């Protein structure tokens, strides 16, 4: 873990700040598109070219962020190039959240979370994309989950960071209304992303995102997106009953990797989501020494996890995976069939010495337990 911590500390600042200390969420070799849908215009950024019949990696950011501030530290991380050389990446910005977005006209009705999900099929059609592997954070994770529930044929896999499957309760709603009277939207967003420990322990990171939220995101548009997220419906997903046909259950059908930092405000929500998903195709990754933005603070660990996830789906089998293999520990595991992710198997390869190691003794393996990994 000490070695990983050293990597983390040297990675953050170059990714987030330039030599003058200003924010640096730069895009590289990208094409931008504004695509009209029945629910309004959506801004999309394409990185790379689609590779044959392979799915495209499609990302969706959280409230207070856009694709640059949410994902570029991750996708610009050196080890991610091993993945991006095999996949095109499609970054979706929620309406009005992209850099330089103008304010919506007075009376504009911002799309609901369900409508934001329904803006994605026209995007795929416009770009001639057949399927996706989605990576979503917070609100973006909810949107991609809704999209996968409505269009399972278009989604091969999901990486859901800080996902909350529940509607906002009336107590939470009332609290947010009251806090809105005394707290500005920037502080509300920061409390959504970061726990108290991280707010106090990582002032440079917090200041970077405070300035980004306050200065780079249109504040009127941000309030509309925040209101839409606060008005979300429950995803109404449910864990399949043992022996029951999975088609009768409303749950995610694709391979799913849930990710949360152990200091994130979203821990309880992610654990709740995990309890509702099919354990056969779900992995829960808890990241130690990490808060609300694991893709920014621990890009190395998340990259390694994503490589395993893709390998389990049959992609990039030759990818080198060493960092996570040295550090991972397993709290519970599933006994799954062939062709599935090493994250979801009881036996995994030790890449450093070529041997295999059993994560749990056979008497505690249970096909109906979700695989949990901490690193």
UniProtKB/Swiss-Prot annotation:
Region (Disordered), start-end ranges: 326-375
Entry-annotated residues carrying Phosphoserine: 331, 334-335, 338, 341, 352, 361, 374
Keyword Membrane applies: no
Biased composition (Low complexity): 330-346
Modified residues (N-acetylmethionine): 1
InterPro entries: AB_hydrolase_fold (IPR029058), NDRG (IPR004142)
Biased composition (Basic and acidic residues): 364-375
Ranges annotated as biased composition (Polar residues): 347-359
Keyword Phosphoprotein applies: yes
Keyword annotations: Acetylation, Phosphoprotein
Residues recorded with modification Phosphothreonine: 322, 329, 332, 355
Family: Belongs to the NDRG family.
PANTHER family cross-referenced by the UniProt entry: N-MYC DOWNSTREAM REGULATED (PTHR11034)
Protein name (record): Protein NDRG3
Annotated source species: Pongo abelii
Lineage per the UniProt record: Eukaryota, Metazoa, Chordata, Craniata, Vertebrata
């Amino acid at each position: 873990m000490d070695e990983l911590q050293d990597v983390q500390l040297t990675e953050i600042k170059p990714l987030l700040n330039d030599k003058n200390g200003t924010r640096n969420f730069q895009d590289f070799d990208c094409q931008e598109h504004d695509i009209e849908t029945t629910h309004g215009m959506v801004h999309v950024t394409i990185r790379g070219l689609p590779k044959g019949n392979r799915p495209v990696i499609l990302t969706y950011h959280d409230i207070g962020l856009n694709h640059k501030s949410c994902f570029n530290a991750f996708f610009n991380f050196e080890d991610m190039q091993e993945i991006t050389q095999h996949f095109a990446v499609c970054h979706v910005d929620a309406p009005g959240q992209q850099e330089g977005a103008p304010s919506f006209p007075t009376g504009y009705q911002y799309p609901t979370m369900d409508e934001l999900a329904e803006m994605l099929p026209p995007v795929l059609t416009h770009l001639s994309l057949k399927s996706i592997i989605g990576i979503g954070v917070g609100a973006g994770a909810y949107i991609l989950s809704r999209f996968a529930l409505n269009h399972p044929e278009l989604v091969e896999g999901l990486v859901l960071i800080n996902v909350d499957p529940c509607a906002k309760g009336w107590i939470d709603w009332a609290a947010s209304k009251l806090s809105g009277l005394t707290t500005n939207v920037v502080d509300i967003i920061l409390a959504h992303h970061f726990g108290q420990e991280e707010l106090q322990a990582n002032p440079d990171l917090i200041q970077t995102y405070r300035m980004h939220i306050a200065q780079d995101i249109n504040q009127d548009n941000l309030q509309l997106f925040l209101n839409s997220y606060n008005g979300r419906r429950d995803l109404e997903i449910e864990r399949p009953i043992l022996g029951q046909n999975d088609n009768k259950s409303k749950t995610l059908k694709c391979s799913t990797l849930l990710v949360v930092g152990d200091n994130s405000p979203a821990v309880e929500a992610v654990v709740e989501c995990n309890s509702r998903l099919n354990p056969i195709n779900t992995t829960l990754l808890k990241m130690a020494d990490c808060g609300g933005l694991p893709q920014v603070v621990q890009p190395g660990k998340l990259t390694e996890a994503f490589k395993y996830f893709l390998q389990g789906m049959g992609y990039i089998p030759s990818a080198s995976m060493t960092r996570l293999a040295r550090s991972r520990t397993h709290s519970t595991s599933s006994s799954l069939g062939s062709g599935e992710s090493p994250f979801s198997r009881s036996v995994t390869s030790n890449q450093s010495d070529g041997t295999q190691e059993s994560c749990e003794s056979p008497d505690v393996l249970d096909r109906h337990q979700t695989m949990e990994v901490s690193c």
